[in-house]
Design a protein with these regions (language model features):
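Short hydrophobic targeting helices and cationic amphipathic motifs
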Residues: 3-6, 11
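Hydrophobic alpha-helical positions that pack around
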Residues: 6, 227-339, 345-350
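N-terminal, Lys/Arg-enriched amphipathic/low-complexity engagement segments
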Residues: 31-83, 133
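Short, well-structured beta-strand-loop connectors
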Residues: 85-98, 117
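Conserved hydrophobic positions within beta-strands
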Residues: 113-115
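Acidic low-complexity segments
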Residues: 117, 122-179, 183-184, 239
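Gly-rich Lys/Arg/Thr-decorated short loops/hinges at beta-loop-alpha junctions or inter-strand turns
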Residues: 168, 189-203, 324
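Ferredoxin-type iron-sulfur electron-transfer modules in oxidoreductases and energy-metabolism complexes
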Residues: 378-394, 404, 408-475
């Protein structure tokens, strides 16, 4: 190589450094290691095209579907337990599956009609759970027992949130009441209005259309928790939502609206807490461990509805978009509605979709067919055309380090991928594969177009399975 000696030395040294990083032998100093993981969130993330085609479109209520299928697992934790049988008549808001365990959530009928079947359905994690199918009578009659709950103290408030069936509506699906039921000292409420994924506008539309409900839920929670700080974090590309949230902040001097850069994944819970209140949530910890409760803006709006009326979570505002959709809209759809019915309400398809997703293009889950139902945590359904799903050929890793540089947690996705392929569980542990939030930044920036995010999912599952095996062996 005909290069000056200093240049040659530099390249040799750099190649050795990259080799070490790739093999994760200096992970104590780069990214995740024994000392924790890189928390420089404000410097991490990626710029994505916004594609907020439905921004400014108020949500439109679709007609009652002919049939709904309500899964008993639309949340993190144990599936709910069916309490109805085939042939039962139900109304909107009738309890059809009760909470079963601490981390669980009840399920309510989203239409009035007759229970047609209770059968196992396979959910996204591959497990089979009971699904309750209800034939709608088209009347959408509310259950006569629906009434606003009596709330006199913190315990009553937590019980109301539990009975509402509300889970994290930003996509995570964690039962919301569990966040409020913590025994940790809580001093800060963070409202997540970041909505950082492309296309999705359901949260921002909710902040505009239901600002008063969000304020009501905030003030109700504050009455029993007496927060020192209440922060609403919104990306700067949502001007109408920012204006509305600032209007409610004027009515309560505890509320502060923090306008955040439009950087993905700004809405990640740990990222949001750091960028709004400056607190670091360590590996394996939750917001409550740093004195915070984090709730999505749509979650708060639905808490308000339940407290005011007693109507549990039976419908969802979802963004319907993508290049294959004829008339993109924000739609109010009964939970359990087949996604095909929702697309039909939006005029159907203008071309055959290449891919249909629950959620956004970064963290969304591919839908196998159009009969699958809208879930509690569904914030969007996208039908993408060929141009939007154009993929390049995967090539070998060039060890550029872009995946680590963009990871919000400073992880080493290339190293995790290598460890997974080698079935090196010890290295997966050291690399902190379980910490990955599955945001997809690594796959997005990878010049070799390697499926790093997909491998991270498999690596997390492998590591968790090994931990469970060890725990079982020690029991």
């Amino acid at each position: 190589m005909n290069l000056p000696i200093l240049t040659r030395v530099y390249f040799v040294g750099y190649n050795i450094f990259v080799e070490l990083c790739f093999n994760s032998r200096i992970s104590d100093y780069v990214g995740y290691g024994k000392v924790g993981y890189n928390m420089a969130f404000s410097l991490k993330g990626i710029k994505l095209p916004h594609r907020k085609n439905t921004a400014g479109m108020s949500a439109v209520r679709m007609p009652a579907p002919k049939m709904v299928t309500l899964l008993t697992s639309m949340h993190v934790g144990k599936p709910a337990k069916p309490v109805v049988k085939v042939g039962d008549t139900v109304s909107v808001g009738t309890l059809i599956a009760e909470q079963d365990g601490m981390i669980s959530s009840p399920v309510y009928s989203s239409v009035s009609g007759t229970v047609k079947s209770i059968a196992d359905a396979v959910i996204s994690n591959g497990k089979a759970v009971p699904a309750i199918t209800i034939e709608s009578d088209g009347n959408m009659t509310s259950d006569e027992s629906i009434a606003a709950p009596q709330i006199n103290n913190k315990e009553d408030f937590i019980e109301a949130v539990k009975k509402s069936g509300i889970v994290g509506l930003g996509g995570a699906g964690f039962p919301t009441y569990v966040k409020f039921a913590t025994d940790k000292k809580i001093d800060t409420l963070v409202i997540n209005g970041a909505e950082c994924e492309p296309y999705i506008t359901s949260d921002s539309v909710t902040m505009v259309d239901r600002a008063d409900d969000i304020l009501f839920a905030i003030e109700t929670a504050d009455r029993y928790f007496n927060f020192e700080k209440i922060v609403i974090g919104i990306e700067k590309n949502k001007s109408a939502a920012i204006t509305k949230m600032k209007e409610i902040a004027v009515k309560n001097n505890k509320i502060k609206v923090v306008v955040l850069p439009s950087v993905y994944p700004q809405g990640g819970e740990k990222v949001l807490v750091y960028n709004t209140v400056g607190r670091v949530i360590s590996a394996g910890k939750l917001p409550a461990d740093v004195g915070c409760i984090v709730c999505n803006s749509s979650t708060m709006a639905n808490i308000a509805r339940y407290i005011k009326t007693g109507m549990p979570l039976v419908e969802k505002v979802i963004t319907v978009d993508g290049g294959a959709v004829k008339e993109p809209k924000n739609v109010i759809a009964p939970i359990g509605t087949p996604v095909g019915d929702v697309f039909d309400f939006c005029g159907g398809f203008k071309c055959d979709p290449e891919k249909v997703l629950y959620g956004g293009p970064m963290m969304g889950i591919a839908v196998p067919d159009l009969s699958v139902p809208v879930l509690k945590q569904t914030n969007a359904i996208l039908a993408l055309d060929k141009k939007e799903t154009n993929t390049s050929k995967t090539t070998a890793c060039i060890r550029c380090g872009k995946c680590t540089n963009t990871c919000p947690f400073g992880l080493n996705p290339a190293g995790i991928s290598k460890a997974y392929k080698n079935d090196d569980v010890e290295m997966l542990e050291k690399l902190g594969a379980d910490i990955c939030m599955l945001c997809g930044c690594c796959s997005f920036v990878c010049p070799a177009k390697r499926p790093l995010a997909e491998t991270n999912v498999l690596a997390k599952n492998r590591l968790m399975a090994e931990r469970a095996k060890k725990k079982e062996g020690n029991a």
